[in-house]
Amino acid sequence: MARYLGPKLKLSRREGTDLFLKSGVRAIDSKCKLETAPGQHGARKTRLSEYGVQLREKQKVRRTYGVLEKQFRNYYKDAARTKGNTGENLLTLLETRLDNVVYRMGFGATRAEARQLVSHKSIMVNGSVVNIPSFKVSANDVISIREKSKKQARIIAALEVASQREKPTWVEVDNTKMEGAFKRLPERSDLSAEINEQLIVELYSK
């Protein structure tokens, strides 16, 4: 399945919530009707089945993190094999993706932009260039911007935007040095309460 390259707001409207796919402190302005699905018949209210509700939740999370269907299923399988709560394990795996950590640290205005920075070899992990967006970041890893990339306007702009929003407690960032430390794995209470990971577990358990 190819990565979606269409309008970002359409995905947020499809899921009925801000997926933070657009750059900016406030990703979506008041003119965007999140409660209305895209398309000619978007205003029609459709009662979803139990399966439909579970599917929508899975799509919402998958699109938030910018992960393809096959990748997402593999993350779920890994989460199910890991000791502990499968749903929480899934969110932890998604949060430890390098592109997501780069976004959380504020080096990319969106996860898509962060993914591009990684792919274009602008990101270093513990002093070595890593260009794999799905690279798994571990506790205490140091993420930094490659020296020759530090003057990129989009990185400087992203850091400016990030300075205006609350930083995640599990990362520590030095904006001047353009580097940050992944201090610990995020706990469930650190992450969005709008995600109901149990619905995803129920979907894949069928």
Curated annotation (Swiss-Prot):
Which Gene Ontology molecular-function terms are recorded? rRNA binding; structural constituent of ribosome
- One Pfam match, given by its short name, reads Ribosomal_S4
A Gene Ontology annotation in the biological process aspect, one of them, is: ribosomal small subunit biogenesis
Q: Which domain of life is it from?
A: Bacteria
Domain spans labelled S4 RNA-binding: 96-156
Does the entry feature the keyword Transport, yes or no? no
Kindly indicate whether the keyword Transport belongs to this entry: no
Keywords, ordered alphabetically: Ribonucleoprotein, Ribosomal protein, RNA-binding, rRNA-binding
**Matches recorded under CDD domains:** S4
Cellular component (GO) terms are: small ribosomal subunit
- Which family does the entry's similarity section mention? Belongs to the universal ribosomal protein uS4 family.
Q: What does this protein do?
A: One of the primary rRNA binding proteins, it binds directly to 16S rRNA where it nucleates assembly of the body of the 30S subunit.
Q: Which PANTHER family match?
A: 30S 40S RIBOSOMAL PROTEIN, SMALL RIBOSOMAL SUBUNIT PROTEIN US4M
The protein's matches in NCBIfam families, at most eight in alphabetical order, are given as: PRK05327.1, rpsD_bact
Assembly behavior:
Part of the 30S ribosomal subunit. Contacts protein S5. The interaction surface between S4 and S5 is involved in control of translational fidelity.
Q: What is this protein called in UniProt?
A: Small ribosomal subunit protein uS4
Write down the species: Shewanella sediminis (strain HAW-EB3)
List the taxonomic lineage. Answer: Bacteria, Pseudomonadati, Pseudomonadota, Gammaproteobacteria, Alteromonadales
* Gene this chain is encoded by: rpsD
